[in-house]
Amino acid sequence: MTSSTIPNPTKTQGILLLDKPEGKTSFYLVSVLRRLTGIKKIGHAGTLDPFATGVMVMLVGQNFTRLAEKFQNHDKAYRATITLGIETDSYDIDGEIVAKSDKAPTLEEIHEVLTSFQGTVKQIPPMFSAKRQNGKKLYELARQGLSVEREPKTVTIKTILVDYEYPILTLDIDCTKGTYIRSIAHDIGQMLGCGAFVSKLVRTRSGPFQLQDCISLPPQG
């Protein structure tokens, strides 16, 4: 996506679609927009992990930030690149490696496992997540070396195989709010018996908002 001029008038209110760059937090986008526009009331309609890229629906002005929950409830779509044969503690590329395997699943095995990731399923959130349990965020406990029992959450997903050439598995995933793509990758690895983690993640859609409609932030000094 090419960079485009960010609206600057302080009275601007509305929705701004950004393509989040890799390595940046969702709050980074909020802070940059606040600085560029002078508007303090800026939020978003769903966070992305730092390693992920893609659609960020930025809500500018009080009339839109107060609608955050409505936008957050939208279904999402992702292109996930999953590396097989390696398991990390965070289920993604930023985590520490905790297991390795030389097993190379066949395409038939991949197809069979993916049938478990269609429709309504129960999903256990990863320890490295912002989900709260007993008043604490799970990632805070994980950083202390703790692992606690997590309540499974019901989500609805549709998984499409895009490409498979060991060790790289590429999937398109449509899902409801609160679905952890990292958990899908981890669970696939467990079912295949080889381990897996998300090595690249692109959010391609958030509700009606598509990646091709997003702009990139201008370079920051």
Write out the residue ranges for each language-model feature.
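Catalytic/RNA-binding core of pseudouridine synthases
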Residues: 1-221
